Amino acid sequence: YGNVRIFTGSYSSPNMNFRVTTLGTVHQPNQPAFLVRDSNSSSAFGANAYADFDTVILNRGNHYNTSNGRFTAPIAGTYLFISLMLSNGSNRLFHEIRLNGSQVAGTRTESGTGAGQYQSNTTQAILELAKGDWVAIHVGSGGAYGGSYSNFSGYLLG
């Protein structure tokens, strides 16, 4: 322990750029991150389709594409993705996080019978991505409400 040196200053490489303060706080100003949701809370995402979240809350680096619902990794690294979806009334909901079109995580919710029986579910995944890999949310069955009831986020861990 006597030979431990505290690094302060800046570090850059092709895959990361960060600064460490004398207090030990790490700042990554260009770290890819996004949070998106749908613009219409009364609309629903259909079954067997990718969710195309069209309202951007945060899109650092502009790597989330609202036209196709995909986040494309600008650099290789470990990323965290989280999706929260609200079921469409009395329908069940199955939604997946997909990497390059293949399921890597998923959640299924059975709603109650009758109108107004909504359930929410959350799916998350920590993924090792190569530059150019894409991640999107696929609604497998049932349907999901949009608006602030359903969202998708992700960011580079390192």
For each predicted feature, which ranges?
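Extracellular jelly-roll beta-sandwich "head" domains, especially the C-terminal globular C1q domain
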Residues: 2-158
